[in-house]
Curated annotation (Swiss-Prot):
Keywords: ATP-binding, Coenzyme A biosynthesis, Cytoplasm, Kinase, Nucleotide-binding, Transferase
E.C. no: 2.7.1.33
Name the record gives this protein: Pantothenate kinase
Family indicated by similarity: Belongs to the prokaryotic pantothenate kinase family.
Cross-referenced CDD domains: PanK
UniProt lineage: Bacteria, Bacillati, Bacillota, Bacilli, Lactobacillales
SUPFAM superfamilies, sorted: P-loop containing nucleoside triphosphate hydrolases (SSF52540)
Amino acid sequence: MNEFINFDEISRETWQNLYNTSIAPLTHDELESIRSLNDEISLQDVEDVYLPLIHLLRLYKKNLEDMSYSKGLFLQKIVKTPPLIIGISGSVAVGKSTTARLLQLLLSRAFPKLTVDLVTTDGFLYTTDDLKNMGILDRKGFPESYDMEKLTSFLYHVKNGERFEVPIYSHETYDILPNQSQIIDSPDILIVEGINVLQNPQNQLLYISDFYDFSIYVDADEKLIEKWYLERFDSLLKLAKYDQTNFYHQFTKMPEDKVLNLARETWARVNRVNLREYIEPTRNRAEIILHKAENHHIDKIYLKKF
């Protein structure tokens, strides 16, 4: 069966003409401040792709409010509108983080009186020590390396308007930061970004996908993602060259050809396997798929029909 049978394929040209918005435009500096390493994004991308997406999210927000009001009428009591939770998934190096930060910025502009928070699922990885004790350090990034029960609990508490402390993950130390956390306290909109956002653990009464009001999958050809991964790896090495506390500093002492081989092996052994077996199979669970071509150019949008 065609995986996209339940999606409308929309060209960028058609998509950009679907809605003209009055949201204040971003500056080049604002866009640069949220851009991830080696990700390509332009003000034209914001105008053509993301502003129409913001309008679509407005419709989902309004629908959530209307449903809460109608439920209150039925129950004959006040029903508070729960936060709109948006999930963003996709492979490593595909540009999820940039998309998440951009949406946070644009939604804050679209809803200036509302709180828009952003959380990455990296914070729900087990610590390096825990992974070692569990004997799965070499499986870091795979589903079993995440505390999915804690992630589900977090989403449950947020949906119920309750405060939650989220662990903070550092890409510099490649581990959870001890005694540090991000406080999430009753946001109006929450964006959750990570490779496992659409994955559902087995034997759970509640699935992660149950909590999302809207979900996005950032997609690209596997060969392109590999290219972007290798480019990002190289950029991380350059940043770590003079920082001995950085996880990637250890690789700066190696010959360039050996480092490149290591990066390729890591992609083939970990990231490609993870993409094929666990990440890409969740693609059709998303409400919308943003498809990227060369230079991170979004050329097609797939919107779920029902």
